[in-house]
Amino acid sequence: MSLYKPFLLFAGISGTGKTRFIREQVKKNPAQDNYCLVPVRPDWHEPSDLLGYTSRLGGKAEYIPTSVLIFIVKAWCHIIETIHQNEIDGEVNLDWEGKNLEQIAPFWLCLDEMNLAPVEQYFADYLSVLETRHWYTPSELAEYNKHEGAEYEYVYECDPLLKPDVLALLDDTARNKLAKQLGLDLSDGLQKEIWNYFCQHGIAIPFNLMVAGTVNMDETTHGFSRKVIDRALTFDFNEFFPNDFDAYFAPALQPKRLGYPTWSDGRAITDIPELEQHSKESVTFLKAVNGILQQSPFELAYRALNELMLALLAHRPANTAELVAIWDDFMMCKVLPRIEGDSDKLRSHQTAESDLLTDLEKVLAEQFAEHWEGTRPDLFNCKVAAAGEDSAPAEPPLVPCRSKKKLAWMKERLARQCFTSFWP
């Protein structure tokens, strides 16, 4: 199942299986070596802790890479099938061509205990470059193929995490040493061409890189700003993938495999006629939610609307129940994690006696209709085949609305402590 963001936060109490869940995602492709576990250190404070740095201790510039940068290069090598040359204004420009998407596995980078250090500091470069990813929409791709006389399945662009200017400061010896440290064999024709491409354009975020951070909220960890939350998909792990003691030995559900997104511009939904009505209803839904959040620090903007459209493109709802499930999960992953504060900060702007959480409950009850008090399809889990059955049932399991339970929990916490937040 494709997600609509490649950056995930798995929040929950210790021991729920967050790190193991991420490791399980790669079992479908065990030969790819497409999993990297990086324990975050409390003393990380700048992007060089994540991506490496330039050292001049030996008198000459030398780049010291990290396991994260090595893994990023490995993900790119899995994507790239060939490097070709184009001449633009007399200069040779290198460009890459990738394998078919079905041949490209996701590469999972697990940042364990991600908030032991201030995420806004050591993760700043990734958070900025993440917003530059661009997949061509079907109409853009058709125009591009027409102009180039090509038949590309996709075109993906992204700014570099490691800029070419940094590599240009290195002499040939230092560059060759770095290439070797990054796992590239310059005696191999394709890998040498990939390295030449990196030297010309820098090293960007590969589209198959899934970054997943495990999060515990206690006295030893740091909180998240809305800058981080807005760029991530946040999962309250035990709500999406609950620890059911009764099903420990014979689970009835299993999590779906998660894949990388292949969309970045929600306006691509206009190229999908069967999603037209759902997109209009989703805009109405988000406007209703934002009507409650206006005049508060939690008001939503274009990024939220774009990502709701991307959620429709990723899940392709077949009916109203699945559409409500997308809305419910969107509230859990994108809206409620942004909301925190005391009674004054969460005061309703509609009535003096109410609060923002109560107002949200009323809007969601209206928008979700009968599903608010009933159930909705679970988009992230599937049923396990029972003993004696050849295959699992095709219909998705049904679960209560997750945002209803979370809002009730946040309201109870606000009443008890005069402060609340999304985080368990």
Roles of regions detected by a PLM:
Residues M1-P424:
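C-terminal regulatory/interaction module of P-loop NTP-utilizing enzymes
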